[in-house]
């Protein structure tokens, strides 16, 4: 049995609470969430790292160094605070141990480049992804060449746009040239122009929305609503990586996505204007 170490900004959040059971369901006793470190108590619920460990059956580590030493593989969480990833990754990515870094990987391209440069310097296998990459509707995509995409999904740009942006860029398979942002209190839309002249839009609604796309191709238009168990598929791929499988997402793809994300953050400051990626 390989022992997983959780490293989080605060542990009482949906990913840390859900992953242990998902991992057990996927691979049984091949992997176990054995150790955990949380930098602070949850600012939402007040639960401390010690209380979380007592609830979920993990051993509390007082430092990241202690956790990295004891663990076989590492999982850096902080899914709602991607600005913490660079700090939380400093010791794990020097360890050489397989490391998964939860979504969203980084706030912008320079941060993402520094994180991956550290991993490459020390030979640490690692990757990051949106679970939506593994939605059956996208993985099994077959169509004539794509000419344009309109994508919709829930919640605000900062935390949830990765779940639309990553599968969109995976399907189009082309770098983004520039972006334009518009929005109001409960919604936003990002226009994306790709370097080959194709276009896409990405819209988020704070009130909630299914993950869906309308995809135009040279043959026909398709509406795709994600209904598959994409989180289960993501966990299966994560476990395979921890058990010795290949890195699941090339660093170059993630860096391209983070470049777009950083450009949109700049575009939010000047709505209605194109910003180069």
PLM feature spans:
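Interdomain hinge/lid region at the active-site interface
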Residues: 208-246
């Amino acid at each position: 049995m390989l022992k997983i170490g959780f490293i989080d900004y605060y542990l009482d959040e949906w990913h840390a609470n859900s992953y242990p059971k998902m991992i057990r369901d996927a691979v049984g006793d091949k992997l176990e969430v054995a150790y955990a470190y949380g930098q602070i108590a949850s600012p939402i619920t007040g639960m401390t790292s010690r209380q979380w460990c007592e609830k979920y059956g993990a051993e509390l580590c007082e430092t990241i160094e202690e956790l990295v030493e004891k663990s076989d593989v590492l999982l850096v969480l902080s899914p709602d605070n991607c600005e913490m990833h660079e700090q939380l990754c400093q010791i794990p990515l020097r360890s050489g141990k397989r490391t998964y870094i939860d979504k969203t990987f980084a706030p912008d391209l320079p941060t993402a480049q520094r994180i991956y440069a550290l991993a490459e310097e020390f030979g640490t296998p690692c990757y990051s992804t949106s679970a939506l990459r593994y939605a059956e509707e996208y993985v099994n995509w077959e169509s004539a060449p794509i000419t344009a995409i309109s994508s919709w999904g829930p919640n605000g740009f900062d935390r949830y746009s990765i779940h639309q942006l990553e599968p969109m860029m995976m399907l189009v398979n082309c770098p983004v040239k520039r972006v334009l942002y518009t929005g109001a209190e409960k919604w936003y839309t990002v226009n994306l122009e790709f370097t080959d002249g194709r276009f896409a839009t990405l819209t988020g609604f704070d009130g909630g929305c299914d993950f869906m796309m309308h995809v135009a191709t040279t043959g026909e238009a398709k509406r795709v609503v994600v209904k598959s168990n994409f989180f289960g598929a993501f966990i299966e791929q994560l476990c395979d990586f921890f058990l010795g499988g290949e890195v699941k997402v090339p660093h170059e793809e993630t860096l391209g996505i983070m470049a777009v994300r950083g450009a949109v953050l700049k575009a939010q400051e000047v709505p209605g204007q194109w910003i180069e990626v």
